[in-house]
């Protein structure tokens, strides 16, 4: 088809998009806006196969802009232009917020469905890219763990990296979680957010934002962000906020990354939580040891049967749960037990202890899981005593954040090709297996006598799952053996004592 025909097809889709208010009188204007974005060029026929959906047409127009030398063939410039094109079907922030809260008054579930569907339809949530991820479950003694190899985020082009280094740093937006991102065009070193929308809501009389994650790791992966650019802090307000969010956003869990390096998430500079509609393995795990806290007979409590050190609190009164959780946090921040290598802080006062909290509703009951974290390092474990140890870092060496804590592994893209080479090695075929996988692969060979091309993929997937289980055990402060659990009980007794 001709370039102008492609533009017209896109405009037809735009003008009939359910959330737009365009009329026939707007079509010429829209045509010229798109023509300006992609460049006029000549009328050389455009190669555009299967361009039937709005997003397919957008991709074809981005390629047209590259062909017309309107933009460079760089992932960032493609994303920037793509977001500008999809902004044409995205209502203004005020309209999105009005629609969301009008629906919410009648049915909160319909409001969530509206915003989620819009965020997919306007290509803010990268549905096609997310579909590239590899995902499978692996049975373990803690239940099924969820394994994902993250292929959705494009690798950074070396040329793009080099160009980004030459750009002037503006300091705007302050970070990728600021409200300033809404509608921001993007740069080579900062993601395009022209088609990004944020729903505002009140949390403890403060303005917060609710959005979806563009590269979701699970169903309806959400981010709840503070309207102010302030550092992450885990305190009583955190527990109060999480419990309010799960009440306000039905069907969603809400959790926070820890607020210390090594055990925290990748962004510690902006207060935010994550949530979504997903039942994680940890949420399914039962209580292994019931607990009772003095003065809290109305709250069910216990140690969760999980590789990390988790205390679960359940009850009908959010304020009571919040208060007990805050007491546990305070005690943990000052608790040391040298017998099991637990140290609250250094001599200079540098803190080591915090909590990764996750809240959810169980019917009319509030539930919060408190995952104890310790970010000590040692000569033996320079990356962290309670961090993936060296012998499992060939699979996972990054921080164990909120999502991994709950039993969903987010593994790096390199593992797709690397595991294929491991499979060849296990089948005694010519291979280019990375040397750092050899010890692990040899152990797999020793443990399994009948490895064939027919079963090797499932076998390797299961072994990756076992490594992830070990990763979580490494991150657990009180180990699951008798000594570790006795030490855990000892800490819970401290909570009961002033």
Curated annotation (Swiss-Prot):
Class in the EC hierarchy, top level? transferase
- Under which pathway is this protein filed? Carbohydrate metabolism; galactose metabolism
Q: Name one GO cellular component term.
A: cytoplasm
> Which UniProt keywords are listed?
Carbohydrate metabolism, Cytoplasm, Galactose metabolism, Nucleotidyltransferase, Transferase
Catalytic reactions on record: alpha-D-galactose 1-phosphate + UDP-alpha-D-glucose = alpha-D-glucose 1-phosphate + UDP-alpha-D-galactose
Major subcellular site: cytoplasm
User: Which compartment or compartments is the protein found in?
Assistant: Cytoplasm
GO biological process entries: galactose metabolic process
For this UniProt entry, the molecular function terms from Gene Ontology, in alphabetical order, are: UDP-glucose:hexose-1-phosphate uridylyltransferase activity
Q: Which domain of life is it from?
A: Bacteria
The record's section on InterPro entries has: GalP_uridyl_Trfase_II (IPR000766), GalP_uridyl_Trfase_II_CS (IPR023425), GalP_Utransf_C (IPR005850), GalP_Utransf_N (IPR005849)
Q: Family membership, please give it.
A: Belongs to the galactose-1-phosphate uridylyltransferase type 2 family.
Give the protein's recorded name: Galactose-1-phosphate uridylyltransferase
Organism of origin is Latilactobacillus sakei subsp. sakei (strain 23K) (Lactobacillus sakei subsp. sakei)
Q: Which gene encodes it?
A: galT
């Amino acid at each position: 088809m001709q370039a102008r025909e492609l533009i017209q097809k896109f405009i037809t889709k735009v003008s009939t998009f359910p959330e737009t208010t365009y009329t026939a009188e707007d079509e010429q204007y829209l045509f010229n806006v798109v023509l300006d974005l992609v460049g006029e060029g000549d009328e050389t026929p455009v190669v555009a196969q299967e361009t039937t959906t709005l997003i397919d047409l957008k991709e074809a127009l981005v390629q047209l802009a590259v062909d017309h030398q309107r933009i460079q063939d760089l992932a960032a410039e493609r994303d920037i232009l793509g977001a500008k094109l999809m902004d044409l079907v995205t209502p203004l922030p005020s309209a999105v917020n009005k629609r969301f809260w009008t629906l919410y008054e009648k049915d909160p579930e319909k409001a969530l469905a509206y915003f989620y569907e819009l965020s997919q339809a306007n290509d803010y949530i990268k549905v096609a890219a997310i579909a590239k991820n590899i995902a499978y479950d692996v049975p373990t003694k803690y239940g099924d763990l969820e394994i994902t190899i993250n292929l959705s985020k494009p690798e950074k082009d070396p040329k793009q990296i080099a160009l980004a280094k030459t750009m002037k740093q503006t300091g705007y937006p302050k970070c990728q979680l600021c409200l300033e991102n809404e509608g921001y065009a993007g740069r080579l070193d900062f993601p395009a957010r022209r088609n990004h929308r944020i729903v505002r809501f009140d949390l403890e009389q403060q303005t917060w934002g609710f959005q979806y994650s563009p590269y979701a790791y699970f169903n309806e992966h959400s981010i709840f962000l503070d309207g102010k650019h302030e550092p992450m802090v885990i305190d009583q307000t955190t527990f109060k906020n999480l419990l309010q969010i799960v009440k306000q956003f039905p069907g969603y869990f809400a959790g926070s990354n820890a607020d210390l390096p090594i055990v925290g998430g990748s962004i510690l500079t902006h207060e935010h939580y994550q949530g979504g509609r997903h039942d994680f393995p940890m949420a399914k795990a039962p209580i292994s040891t019931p607990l009772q806290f003095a003065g809290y007979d109305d709250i069910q409590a216990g140690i969760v049967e999980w590789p990390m050190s988790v205390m679960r609190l359940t009850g009908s009164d959010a304020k009571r749960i919040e208060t007990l959780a805050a007491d546990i946090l305070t005690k943990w921040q000052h608790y040391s037990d040298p017998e099991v290598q637990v140290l609250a802080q250094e001599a200079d006062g540098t803190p080591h202890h915090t909590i990764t909290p996750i809240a959810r509703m169980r019917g009319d009951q509030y539930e919060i899981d408190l995952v104890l974290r310790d970010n000590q390092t040692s000569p033996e474990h320079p990356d962290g005593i309670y961090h993936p140890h060296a012998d499992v870092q060939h699979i996972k060496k990054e921080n164990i954040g909120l999502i991994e804590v709950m039993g969903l592994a987010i593994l790096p893209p390199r593992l797709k090709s690397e595991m294929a080479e491991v499979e060849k090695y296990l089948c005694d075929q010519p291979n280019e297996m990375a040397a750092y996988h050899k010890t692990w692969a040899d152990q797999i060979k020793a443990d399994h006598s009948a490895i064939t091309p027919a079963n090797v993929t499932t076998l390797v997937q299961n072994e990756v799952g076992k490594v992830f289980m070990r990763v979580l055990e490494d991150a657990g402060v009180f180990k699951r053996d008798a000594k570790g659990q006795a030490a855990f009980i000892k800490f819970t007794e401290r909570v009961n004592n002033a």
